[in-house]
Amino acid sequence: LTAAIPVISVMGVQACPLPTAILSAQTGFPSYYCDDYTDRMDILMDEWQKMDFHPDGIYTGFLADAAQADKAVDFIQRFKKKETKVLVDPVMGDDGEEYPIYTEELCEKMRMLVREAAVITPNITEALLLLYGREKMHTEWQKISEFSGEELLGYVQTIGSLLTEKFDVEAVITGISHEEDGAKYISNLICKKAAQTWVTTKKEGGSYSGTGDLFASILSAGMVKGTDTAASVQKAVNFLTKGIHDAVEEGTDRNEGICFETYLYELADVK
């Protein structure tokens, strides 16, 4: 939330957070305290219904277990209107490994959740989990680890087509690392049923916590404002590239995230 709220706000959209948990620090740190809010989510939703609350957009991110995924589906079904823009970031794993929260039940509930969305933002690992589950994800990951850059990009395009067909959504597959002529790049693939679009930039540094949250927040606010997905992805890539560069220059620990605050003003649509 500390990444999402400032991004959504500076883009001119009011953020109304429904916490699933309050943490002392993100889960990449060796020690953290987590106060689970699952049993209080219904109370908050009930109060919002009394207010006749109907958001213009709904964005779901990290969910700690299958019960929270159920609550997220319930939230969408309670508050979504015909014109409500829904984005789901199906947080389950990265780099061919599931996160500790992962269970097959969570994955099945996440499949239900993404069917409520207009746009989803999985990385390759999460795309494979949505399509195949844990066992086949690992098999596929071993296979793609041997691919050249061109083979990997072709494979991701196939996965993107499968996602859009199976879940009837627009899928943005994020954080695809590859090499071309000795240079390192990171790409994002926008997958619609009729077309696919690549947005690519040179890669700098390693993996930083919170970049996926920032990326999805820019897309979700853009959806509410009627911005084309490709334009929002390019905006997110430009923003993240600058924050990552500063984090590398300053030697910021990956668990601290990137240095994005300086560039928040660039997300605002100044009139």
Give names to the regions the model predicted.
Residues 1-88, 92-100, 261-268:
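Conserved N-terminal subdomain of the carbohydrate kinase-like
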Residues 57-61, 87-95, 121-129, 173-174, ...:
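Short beta-strands and strand-loop turn motifs
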